[in-house]
Curated annotation (Swiss-Prot):
Keyword entries, A-Z: Degradation of host capsule during virus entry, Degradation of host cell envelope components during virus entry, Host-virus interaction, Viral attachment to host adhesion receptor, Viral attachment to host cell, Viral tail fiber protein, Viral tail protein, Virion, Virus entry into host cell
GO biological process, one term: symbiont entry into host cell via disruption of host cell envelope
Protein known as: Depolymerase, capsule K63-specific
Organism encoding this protein: Klebsiella phage KP36 (Bacteriophage KP36)
The protein's assembly and partners: Homotrimer.
Amino acid sequence: MALYREGKAAMAADGTVTGTGTKWQSSLSLIRPGATIMFLSSPIQMAVVNKVVSDTEIKAITTNGAVVASSDYAILLSDSLTVDGLAQDVAETLRYYQSQETVIADAVEFFKNFDFDSLQDLANQINADSESAQSSAAAAAASENAAKTSENNAKSSEVAAENARDQVQQIINDAGDASTLVVLANPDGFRHIGRCKDIATLRTIEPVESRQVIEVLSYYNGLAQGGGTFWYDPNDSVTEDNGGSCIVTNGGKRWKRIIDGAVDVLSFGAKPDDISFDSAPHIQAALDNHDAVSLYGRSYYIGSPIYMPSRTVFDGMGGKLTSIAPSTAGFMAGSIFAPGNYHPDFWEEVPKVAATTTLGSANITLADPNIVNVGDIIRLSSTTGVLSAGFFVSEYLQMARVLSKTGNVITIDGPVESQLTLVAANANQPGYLARFNKPLFCCVDSIIQNIEIDTWDYWTADSATYNVKFSNIWGSAKAVAYGNTFCRSLFEDIRIVFSGRVSELAFGSHDTNLVRITAIASPKGLSASVVFGWAESGRRCTIDTFSIMLNANANPSTVIRVSGHRDSLIKNGSIYVHNNTNNILSVENYGTTADGVRPDCDNITFENVSIFVTGSSAVVCDVYKSADNSVIKNVAFKNIKYFGPTPSVALYRARGTLANFVKGVQANISSDTGGAIVLSNSENNVLTFTGPVSVTSLVSAAAKNTLSIRNYARSSAKANNFTQESTLNVTDTTANAVSKEFTYPAGSLRINDKIKLSLGGSTAGTVGKKTVQVGFIGSDGAFKYVELAALATDQVYWTMEVEISFLRTTNSQTNELETSAIITSFLSKGAATGAALSGSRALAVVSDLALSNFVVQVRAWKENAADGLSLSRMNLQLEDLTA
C-alpha cells in the first residue's frame, strides 16, 4: 500500500485540510479523489479526499466534523492496487518524464527502482549520455568553433535518453508475469503485497519507522477473520497487550489497531458459529478496552457471563449469544450478562459510613467524604431491614450520582426519600469480591441492545445498574427482566420464551421501567410458582405494554404479586392463563416479624390489564394484609377486564386483620361471567364491578365501602357470549371454511356496543399455509376480516385480540347517515426465538342494526391436511356498559 506523508497537515470542521511543506498537486504525488487521509493524532482521525485544490489544500469528506491540529499524517494511495488505479499511476509517471526532458537524470533514478538486469545497462547508458551532454555544453562555452559539435552531441544524448525511456517501457511490457507492475496490476495482484498472517506473528514483528503501518490478514492463521490495519505508536511503552487493539511485540513495541466505529469482537479473537470455542473471554476483553463493541450480526457461544463495564455500548446488530455452560454449573453460571455484580450477601462485609440526611433533600453529610468523588455513584441504605433467605435486605436503598462535594457535604441527583437512619458506601468496591470472585461493582451509563440470547439460566441476574438500557433483546432464558438493584434503568422491547419468571426487581430497584415486554412460557413448563414478583425495598418501577402468555404446562399459583414496593405501576397489558390456583393480580404485605422490618406497599396501580383464562381461575384481583402491622395504602385496580370461566373463589378479594383493615383501594373490574366479591376486614374502599357478580354480605359491604355493580342484562345480545371449553383442531382444507358463527339478532346491538373476541392456538407442520380469519358480513355481502396467515415454515403459538365497534358515518354520495363497523386486531405469533407482533384493521358499511342481523364469523383452514392448526382458546364477549 503506497503512502504520501510529506510535511504535516491539519483539518478544519468543514473538511478543509491545510498542509505545511506539502506538494499535493505534484504530478508524482498520485493523490486523487477517493484516497484516504489518516491523521496520526490521538485519537486517530480519518477522512476521504474529495478534491485536491492546491499543493497545500485538500477538500475532504466523511470527516464526522472532526477538527485536527497540525500533525503527522498519511494519505493511503490504495487505489494503486487496482488495475485501473495502477495503470493511471504508470501513465501519470510516464507523462511526467515526457514533459521533463531536461531532467533525464530524475527519470533514471525513478526507473532504477525496477529490478531488471537490462534496466541497469540502460541506466549506465543514460548516465554516459548525460555526461556527454554536459561535456558538449562546456565545450560550447569554451570554443565558438566547437558549438555546433556540442549542439549535435547534446541532441544525440537527448535522443539516446528518449530511446532509453522507450526501451524501459518495452522491457516492462515484454517482462509479462515477471514484471512487478504487471503482477500487481493483475486482478489478484493485492495478494503479492507483503502482509502479516495473524496476530501471533504480529507480536514477532518489530517496527522500524515511527507510525509504521502494517496489514494483518487474520486473528488466527487461516481463518480469514479478525485481521486489520495496525500502526506503530512510538510514544507508548506502557499499554498492556489486550489481545485485540494493542499488540505488544517481543521487543516491547506497541502496534495499535486502526478502528472505525464499534469494535468487532472478531478483533479480539472471538470465533463465530463455533460451539467448541468459548468466546466469552474475548468478548469481555473487547468490552473492557473499548466503549463501543458489536457482534455485527454474528453468533457466538460463551461459557460464562459477560460482565458489562460502565459507559459502554454493546450492540449485537442482530447477533446472538448462546451459553454453553452446563446446566449443573449452578446459579448464574449460564447467565449471558452481569451488568454489575451485586447481592446483599456480598455487601455485608463492605465498610459503610454514617450519612446524615433530611427527607426531601439532596444534600448529605458524610462521616467520611473521601469514600466518593464527584461523578461517582453512592449507595445509601437503611440500618433496618429484614433477613431474607439468610441475608440482610435493607428497608430502604437508594443509588445516586454525586453532583458536587464541599467538605463533608455532598449533593446527589435526587432527594432522599426516607427518614430512616442511613449509611453510605461507594457503589463500586473493586477491593471486595462477589460472585465468581469478580469485583463488586455497579454498571453505570451503559447500553445493551439488538441481541438474541439463548440460555437455560437467567440472562441477567446478580446485577446492579444505574442509568443502563436494555433494548431489543429476544430469545430464550429462565426469566424476562430479572435481577437486583436496577436503578434509573430501562428494559424496552424484550421478547423472551421463559422457563422461570417474567420479572423480579429486587433489593432496592428503583426508577426502572419495563416497556413493550413479551413473555412466552416455555412449552416445558415453569419452575417458579410466582412468575412476576416485585419485592424487597423497590419503588417507582413501571411495566407498560406487556403480554404474558402461559400455556397448559405453565400454571403458576400467582401471576403478578407486588410486595415491599411503592409507587409502582403495571399497565396496558394482557395476561393469558390456562389454570391458576391462587391469584392473578395481587398486592400483599407481611409486616414486621422476628426476621425484621419489611417495607410498606404504597401507591400500587394496575391499569388497563386484560386477563384471559381458558381453564380455571381462583382469584383474579387480591389485596392481603397478613399481620396487624402490615402496611398497604393507595392500591388501585383500574379498568381490569376478565375473560374466562367464573373464578372459583373471587373476582375480587380483600383481606385484612381485625386490627388492620384493608382501606383505600379503588377498583374498576369487569367480568361478563361474573364472580364473587369477597371482602374480609375491608372498609373505606371505592369498588365498581361490571357483570353478574355476587357480593357476600352485600348490605354490610355496601355500608363500609362505596360499592357499585353494573350488570345490564340484554339476553338476546349476550346469548352469543362464548367460551371455548376444549381445543378445536382444524381439519378443513377448503379456503374460507367457517369454524364458528355468531348471529346477533336485529335490534339486539347498539351503536356504542363493542364485540371482543380473543383467540389463541398453535400451528404445526411445514407443508402448507395455515389461515385464521375473524370478521363480519358487510352490507354488500362481502366478508370483512382481520387475518392470521402462518407461512408453511411457521410453527408457532398465536393469539388474536379482536374488537368490533360501530359508528355512524355519512355517505359521500347521498349525504345520508349509515352504520359502519370497524374491526381491529392485535396479533402475536410467538416461537422459540421470540414473538412477532402486528396489528390490522378493516372498515365497512353494515346493514341497519335495528333491522338486520349482524353476523360474526371465525374462519380457519389449512392448505395441507398433514399440517396442524388448532384453536385452543376462543372467548367472545359483548362489552355492554350502557343502559
